[in-house]
Amino acid sequence: MSKIKLSLFCILALCGCGQASQNTENQPVTVACYYFPNYHTGDPRNEAAKGVGWTEWELVKKARPRFAGHRQPKVPLWGYTDERDPLAMAQKIDAAANHGIDAFIFDWYMYEDGPFLNRCLDEGFLKAKNTNRLKFSLMWANHDWVEIHPYKRGTDQQLLYPAKVSPKRYDEICDHLVKDYFTKPNYWLIDGKAYFSIYDVQKFVENFGSIEATREAMNRLRNKAIAAGLKGVHWNIVAWGLPILPVENPPANTAELIQLLGFDSATSYVWIHHAQLPDVQTDYNKARDAYFAHWDKAKKEYGVPYFPNVTMGWDSSPRCDLNDEWGNWGYPFTNTLGNNTPENFKTALQQTKDKLLADPNGPRILNINCWNEWTEGSYLEPDTKTGMAYLEAVRDIFGNEK
């Protein structure tokens, strides 16, 4: 960062970085939920690598207990549905909207040579008859995609799709974002600006080569959105301190990058980016407390509104080769969250709501991990053991506000 030190005052004036909203005391809390779109057939990349008809449901089906007290496999109550089917997606939309969720944040993958996992959103969500019951937005999952579906321990994690995109490709992506997503009537706007989140800010800066070039690239998307009739783009950064995926390297100074680049807000994807898992089944409430400590720190240091996260669970064992010895060897061979009961999840939701409302001028937004991270053990969709209990927890805390 020493090579690109600039006057922070000048940068903030140029990029117009977001400030905390005022007079939010009487606003309801917006509940967003991440959505991981790898549960549909017909993706060209998946079919080339895994075979026709492959989806991540195959890993869910094959999962097995790896240690005493380990609950696997998890069986979806609705069956192994295809999310690119508008009828299947309509069921998800109704369930989310009926239980207090306002928006899906789709994990969004776009590479130099085209999209990945896009048919869930393009053919399922946007073509569902009830699509307007939920807002939607995008988190650009701008990380390298490596072969971990499943991963055999000790082997090289093959790089399948590198994250880097050319300047020309980036401009094409910006046009696509504005035309096909940001201007949809149910795209999630904050103060008239399209919410757009970046998963890996370090990789984002590396892509453009410098802070100045990255900031200019962000402004190009803002200007395209304004030209299309919006008030701009609400740029959100996913902050994390502890890497999870093998391709992750946390930035040296997240707070500095937020200011230098002009992000409007910050958030987190999952508690595990901020909470250690010392035990095979680390207690859910301990992870919650560790995450809350990060939240308090982020509010003080980041200088922009921070949207907290509530994580339902963690168990990435379905992504591990079943023939390998189990241990805490590194993702996806990691320890898990235990005691993540619907009751403890509900308590975490209530505590998060209370902390949000305790700040009369703070943001009224949170996100949940996740709607359907089945192979990472964090999902609100019903399974055959707990039914709708996790969705009912969201409804009990937030449903009456809608």
Predicted regions, residues:
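Glycan-processing catalytic domains of CAZymes
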Residues: N23-K402
